Amino acid sequence: MYWGRTSLITIFLLALLSSSAWGGAWCMPKGSLYSKLSYNHYFTVDTFDENGHKRRNPNGSSFRDENITWYNEYGLLDNLTLFASIPHKWLKSRYKFTEGRGLKSTTFTYDGLGDVDLGIRYGLLKEPVVLSLQFLTKVAWFYDSDEAVPPGNNQNDYELKLLLGKSLWPFPGYCGLEMGYRWRTGSPSDEYRYLLEFGMDLIKKFSCRIKLDGIASVKNGDIPKQKPEVNAYIDYDTGQLIKTVSEPSGPGSAFTNPSLGYEYDLGKLEFTLGYACTKSWAFEFTYTNYPYGESIAAGDQYSFGVVYYFSRK
Protein backbone atom coordinates (compact mmCIF):
# COMPACT_ATOMS: atom_id res chain seq x y z
CA MET A 1 0.00 0.00 0.00
CA TYR A 2 1.26 3.45 -0.95
CA TRP A 3 0.17 5.21 2.22
CA GLY A 4 1.39 2.43 4.47
CA ARG A 5 4.83 2.32 2.89
CA THR A 6 5.31 6.06 3.21
CA SER A 7 3.54 6.68 6.51
CA LEU A 8 6.78 7.75 8.18
CA ILE A 9 7.27 10.64 5.76
CA THR A 10 3.64 11.65 5.20
CA ILE A 11 3.51 14.01 8.17
CA PHE A 12 6.94 15.37 7.27
CA LEU A 13 5.82 16.14 3.73
CA LEU A 14 2.57 17.74 4.83
CA ALA A 15 4.35 19.94 7.35
CA LEU A 16 6.68 21.14 4.62
CA LEU A 17 4.30 21.38 1.72
CA SER A 18 0.89 22.71 2.57
CA SER A 19 1.70 26.24 3.67
CA SER A 20 -0.37 27.80 0.91
CA ALA A 21 -2.93 26.94 -1.71
CA TRP A 22 0.01 25.82 -3.87
CA GLY A 23 0.89 23.15 -1.30
CA GLY A 24 2.44 20.44 -3.47
CA ALA A 25 1.20 17.45 -5.45
CA TRP A 26 0.39 15.22 -2.45
CA CYS A 27 -3.27 14.71 -1.60
CA MET A 28 -4.45 14.40 1.98
CA PRO A 29 -5.49 10.94 3.23
CA LYS A 30 -9.26 10.51 3.48
CA GLY A 31 -10.63 12.16 6.62
CA SER A 32 -7.38 14.02 7.35
CA LEU A 33 -7.19 17.71 8.18
CA TYR A 34 -4.32 20.16 7.79
CA SER A 35 -4.81 23.64 9.25
CA LYS A 36 -2.35 26.52 9.41
CA LEU A 37 -2.82 29.93 11.02
CA SER A 38 -0.10 32.37 9.99
CA TYR A 39 0.87 35.98 10.61
CA ASN A 40 2.52 37.65 7.62
CA HIS A 41 4.29 41.02 7.42
CA TYR A 42 5.15 42.49 4.00
CA PHE A 43 6.82 45.88 3.51
CA THR A 44 8.22 47.70 0.51
CA VAL A 45 9.65 51.05 -0.56
CA ASP A 46 10.79 49.71 -3.95
CA THR A 47 9.22 48.94 -7.32
CA PHE A 48 10.35 46.89 -10.31
CA ASP A 49 10.05 49.08 -13.41
CA GLU A 50 8.95 47.78 -16.83
CA ASN A 51 12.54 46.75 -17.60
CA GLY A 52 12.96 44.75 -14.40
CA HIS A 53 15.14 47.27 -12.57
CA LYS A 54 14.42 47.80 -8.88
CA ARG A 55 13.91 51.47 -8.06
CA ARG A 56 13.12 53.32 -4.85
CA ASN A 57 9.62 54.81 -4.75
CA PRO A 58 9.48 58.59 -5.21
CA ASN A 59 10.21 60.44 -1.96
CA GLY A 60 10.29 57.14 -0.06
CA SER A 61 6.60 56.26 -0.40
CA SER A 62 5.90 52.93 1.30
CA PHE A 63 3.37 50.12 1.50
CA ARG A 64 2.73 47.60 4.30
CA ASP A 65 0.56 44.50 4.27
CA GLU A 66 0.00 42.74 7.59
CA ASN A 67 -2.36 39.81 7.48
CA ILE A 68 -3.48 36.77 9.39
CA THR A 69 -4.29 33.92 7.02
CA TRP A 70 -6.14 30.72 7.84
CA TYR A 71 -5.37 27.90 5.42
CA ASN A 72 -7.05 24.49 5.50
CA GLU A 73 -6.88 21.20 3.60
CA TYR A 74 -9.27 18.30 4.02
CA GLY A 75 -9.01 14.83 2.48
CA LEU A 76 -12.42 14.08 1.03
CA LEU A 77 -10.97 10.91 -0.53
CA ASP A 78 -7.45 9.54 -0.62
CA ASN A 79 -7.01 11.14 -4.03
CA LEU A 80 -9.31 14.15 -3.63
CA THR A 81 -8.43 17.12 -1.40
CA LEU A 82 -10.39 20.30 -0.73
CA PHE A 83 -8.60 23.47 0.38
CA ALA A 84 -9.36 27.07 1.29
CA SER A 85 -7.40 30.15 2.32
CA ILE A 86 -8.97 33.12 4.14
CA PRO A 87 -6.90 36.25 4.88
CA HIS A 88 -7.68 39.20 7.14
CA LYS A 89 -5.57 42.19 6.11
CA TRP A 90 -4.36 45.41 7.65
CA LEU A 91 -3.00 47.55 4.81
CA LYS A 92 -1.20 50.87 5.06
CA SER A 93 -0.10 52.91 2.06
CA ARG A 94 1.93 56.04 2.77
CA TYR A 95 2.34 58.40 -0.18
CA LYS A 96 5.00 61.10 0.12
CA PHE A 97 5.08 64.12 -2.17
CA THR A 98 6.70 67.52 -2.45
CA GLU A 99 4.66 70.65 -1.95
CA GLY A 100 6.48 73.93 -2.28
CA ARG A 101 9.83 73.45 -0.61
CA GLY A 102 8.66 70.79 1.81
CA LEU A 103 7.87 67.09 1.82
CA LYS A 104 4.39 66.02 2.84
CA SER A 105 2.66 62.68 3.12
CA THR A 106 -0.80 61.19 3.17
CA THR A 107 -1.75 57.77 4.50
CA PHE A 108 -4.44 55.34 3.32
CA THR A 109 -5.49 52.24 5.26
CA TYR A 110 -7.66 49.14 4.96
CA ASP A 111 -8.83 46.69 7.62
CA GLY A 112 -10.81 43.66 6.51
CA LEU A 113 -10.93 40.43 4.55
CA GLY A 114 -9.01 40.00 1.32
CA ASP A 115 -9.43 37.64 -1.62
CA VAL A 116 -10.45 34.12 -0.62
CA ASP A 117 -9.02 31.04 -2.37
CA LEU A 118 -11.14 27.91 -2.78
CA GLY A 119 -9.85 24.83 -4.54
CA ILE A 120 -9.77 21.13 -5.19
CA ARG A 121 -6.82 18.82 -5.91
CA TYR A 122 -7.19 15.46 -7.65
CA GLY A 123 -4.44 12.85 -7.50
CA LEU A 124 -3.64 11.26 -10.86
CA LEU A 125 -0.53 9.20 -10.05
CA LYS A 126 1.32 7.99 -6.96
CA GLU A 127 4.24 6.21 -8.67
CA PRO A 128 6.90 6.76 -9.99
CA VAL A 129 6.10 10.39 -9.19
CA VAL A 130 3.14 12.02 -7.51
CA LEU A 131 1.04 13.80 -10.14
CA SER A 132 -2.04 15.90 -9.38
CA LEU A 133 -4.40 18.28 -11.12
CA GLN A 134 -5.58 21.31 -9.16
CA PHE A 135 -8.36 23.83 -9.76
CA LEU A 136 -8.56 27.06 -7.77
CA THR A 137 -10.94 29.99 -7.76
CA LYS A 138 -10.12 33.32 -6.15
CA VAL A 139 -13.19 35.25 -5.04
CA ALA A 140 -13.50 38.91 -4.09
CA TRP A 141 -16.68 38.78 -2.04
CA PHE A 142 -15.73 40.64 1.12
CA TYR A 143 -14.64 44.15 0.13
CA ASP A 144 -15.91 47.01 -2.02
CA SER A 145 -14.54 48.24 -5.34
CA ASP A 146 -13.81 51.72 -3.95
CA GLU A 147 -11.65 50.82 -0.94
CA ALA A 148 -8.99 53.43 -0.12
CA VAL A 149 -6.41 50.63 -0.26
CA PRO A 150 -7.84 47.72 -2.26
CA PRO A 151 -6.84 44.31 -0.87
CA GLY A 152 -7.30 42.81 -4.35
CA ASN A 153 -8.36 43.59 -7.91
CA ASN A 154 -12.05 43.13 -6.98
CA GLN A 155 -12.63 40.28 -9.43
CA ASN A 156 -12.96 36.51 -9.44
CA ASP A 157 -10.10 34.55 -11.03
CA TYR A 158 -9.73 30.88 -11.99
CA GLU A 159 -6.60 28.75 -12.10
CA LEU A 160 -5.72 25.30 -13.39
CA LYS A 161 -2.42 23.67 -12.36
CA LEU A 162 -0.48 20.48 -12.92
CA LEU A 163 1.58 19.47 -9.88
CA LEU A 164 4.44 16.99 -9.71
CA GLY A 165 6.14 15.77 -6.55
CA LYS A 166 8.81 13.22 -5.73
CA SER A 167 9.84 11.87 -2.35
CA LEU A 168 13.60 11.37 -2.10
CA TRP A 169 13.24 8.68 0.57
CA PRO A 170 15.38 7.20 2.17
CA PHE A 171 16.93 10.65 1.97
CA PRO A 172 14.52 12.67 4.15
CA GLY A 173 13.42 15.15 1.54
CA TYR A 174 11.26 15.87 -1.50
CA CYS A 175 11.15 18.06 -4.60
CA GLY A 176 8.25 19.54 -6.51
CA LEU A 177 7.29 21.29 -9.73
CA GLU A 178 4.07 23.13 -10.54
CA MET A 179 2.86 24.70 -13.78
CA GLY A 180 -0.43 26.47 -14.35
CA TYR A 181 -2.54 29.14 -15.99
CA ARG A 182 -4.69 31.75 -14.25
CA TRP A 183 -7.64 33.29 -16.06
CA ARG A 184 -8.37 36.80 -14.78
CA THR A 185 -11.92 37.98 -15.36
CA GLY A 186 -11.26 41.73 -15.18
CA SER A 187 -8.76 44.16 -16.66
CA PRO A 188 -5.50 42.53 -15.45
CA SER A 189 -3.64 40.17 -17.75
CA ASP A 190 -3.95 36.41 -17.49
CA GLU A 191 -0.94 34.76 -15.89
CA TYR A 192 1.34 31.78 -16.30
CA ARG A 193 2.10 30.29 -12.88
CA TYR A 194 5.15 28.20 -12.01
CA LEU A 195 6.75 26.88 -8.84
CA LEU A 196 9.89 24.94 -7.93
CA GLU A 197 10.56 23.65 -4.42
CA PHE A 198 12.84 21.45 -2.38
CA GLY A 199 12.46 20.44 1.25
CA MET A 200 14.32 18.22 3.67
CA ASP A 201 14.58 17.12 7.27
CA LEU A 202 17.50 18.76 9.09
CA ILE A 203 17.85 17.26 12.54
CA LYS A 204 15.32 15.77 14.91
CA LYS A 205 12.06 17.77 14.68
CA PHE A 206 13.57 20.47 12.40
CA SER A 207 12.94 20.74 8.67
CA CYS A 208 13.50 23.34 5.95
CA ARG A 209 12.07 24.28 2.58
CA ILE A 210 13.14 26.54 -0.29
CA LYS A 211 10.62 27.56 -2.90
CA LEU A 212 10.59 29.73 -6.04
CA ASP A 213 7.05 30.91 -6.77
CA GLY A 214 6.72 32.76 -10.07
CA ILE A 215 4.21 34.71 -12.16
CA ALA A 216 4.66 35.58 -15.85
CA SER A 217 2.14 37.87 -17.53
CA VAL A 218 0.40 36.69 -20.69
CA LYS A 219 0.36 40.36 -21.80
CA ASN A 220 -3.33 40.42 -22.66
CA GLY A 221 -4.50 42.89 -20.03
CA ASP A 222 -6.95 45.70 -20.67
CA ILE A 223 -4.74 48.50 -19.38
CA PRO A 224 -6.66 51.75 -18.73
CA LYS A 225 -5.27 54.74 -20.53
CA GLN A 226 -4.01 57.50 -18.28
CA LYS A 227 -4.39 61.08 -19.37
CA PRO A 228 -1.31 63.30 -19.39
CA GLU A 229 -1.21 66.06 -16.80
CA VAL A 230 -1.66 69.53 -18.31
CA ASN A 231 -0.63 72.72 -16.52
CA ALA A 232 -0.88 76.29 -17.78
CA TYR A 233 0.20 79.70 -16.55
CA ILE A 234 0.56 83.24 -17.93
CA ASP A 235 4.01 84.69 -18.49
CA TYR A 236 3.44 88.27 -17.32
CA ASP A 237 6.59 89.51 -19.08
CA THR A 238 5.28 88.49 -22.51
CA GLY A 239 1.57 88.11 -21.80
CA GLN A 240 1.61 84.65 -23.35
CA LEU A 241 -0.15 81.55 -22.08
CA ILE A 242 2.43 78.86 -21.31
CA LYS A 243 1.17 75.28 -21.32
CA THR A 244 3.13 72.23 -20.12
CA VAL A 245 2.19 68.60 -20.67
CA SER A 246 3.68 65.76 -18.59
CA GLU A 247 3.32 62.13 -19.61
CA PRO A 248 1.80 59.64 -17.15
CA SER A 249 4.28 57.59 -15.20
CA GLY A 250 2.77 54.27 -16.31
CA PRO A 251 -0.23 52.05 -15.65
CA GLY A 252 -0.84 51.10 -12.07
CA SER A 253 1.50 53.74 -10.66
CA ALA A 254 -1.35 55.47 -8.87
CA PHE A 255 -2.44 52.34 -6.99
CA THR A 256 -2.46 52.76 -3.24
CA ASN A 257 -1.69 49.03 -3.24
CA PRO A 258 1.45 48.65 -5.37
CA SER A 259 1.41 44.86 -4.98
CA LEU A 260 -1.45 44.82 -7.51
CA GLY A 261 -0.90 45.35 -11.21
CA TYR A 262 -2.35 44.93 -14.69
CA GLU A 263 0.54 43.25 -16.50
CA TYR A 264 3.50 42.18 -14.40
CA ASP A 265 6.08 39.46 -13.84
CA LEU A 266 7.21 38.49 -10.35
CA GLY A 267 9.40 35.92 -8.65
CA LYS A 268 9.23 35.14 -4.93
CA LEU A 269 12.01 33.18 -3.23
CA GLU A 270 10.87 31.62 0.04
CA PHE A 271 12.94 30.10 2.83
CA THR A 272 11.12 28.19 5.58
CA LEU A 273 12.29 26.60 8.82
CA GLY A 274 9.88 24.21 10.52
CA TYR A 275 9.78 22.70 14.00
CA ALA A 276 7.52 19.72 14.74
CA CYS A 277 6.45 19.73 18.39
CA THR A 278 4.37 16.56 18.04
CA LYS A 279 2.81 14.55 15.23
CA SER A 280 -0.09 16.99 15.29
CA TRP A 281 1.48 20.39 16.01
CA ALA A 282 4.29 22.30 14.31
CA PHE A 283 5.64 25.84 13.94
CA GLU A 284 7.03 27.51 10.82
CA PHE A 285 9.07 30.65 10.22
CA THR A 286 9.36 31.94 6.64
CA TYR A 287 11.32 34.71 4.97
CA THR A 288 10.31 35.67 1.42
CA ASN A 289 12.39 37.83 -0.90
CA TYR A 290 11.35 39.22 -4.29
CA PRO A 291 14.48 38.78 -6.46
CA TYR A 292 13.03 39.75 -9.84
CA GLY A 293 9.96 41.29 -11.44
CA GLU A 294 8.53 43.83 -13.87
CA SER A 295 5.91 46.55 -13.30
CA ILE A 296 5.15 45.51 -9.72
CA ALA A 297 6.24 46.23 -6.16
CA ALA A 298 9.34 44.57 -4.75
CA GLY A 299 9.75 43.95 -1.02
CA ASP A 300 10.31 41.43 1.75
CA GLN A 301 7.92 39.33 3.82
CA TYR A 302 8.27 37.61 7.20
CA SER A 303 5.80 34.95 8.32
CA PHE A 304 5.15 32.87 11.41
CA GLY A 305 2.70 29.99 11.35
CA VAL A 306 1.14 27.44 13.69
CA VAL A 307 0.24 24.13 12.04
CA TYR A 308 -2.22 21.47 13.18
CA TYR A 309 -2.52 18.08 11.46
CA PHE A 310 -5.03 15.32 12.12
CA SER A 311 -5.25 11.95 10.39
CA ARG A 312 -7.40 8.89 10.97
CA LYS A 313 -4.67 6.69 9.51
Predicted feature residues:
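Hydrophobic, lipid-facing positions within transmembrane beta-strands of outer-membrane proteins
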Residues: 33, 66-70, 114-118, 158-162, ...
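Outer-membrane pore/translocation modules
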Residues: 93-183, 188-189, 225, 229-262
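Outer membrane beta-barrel transmembrane domains
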Residues: 197-313
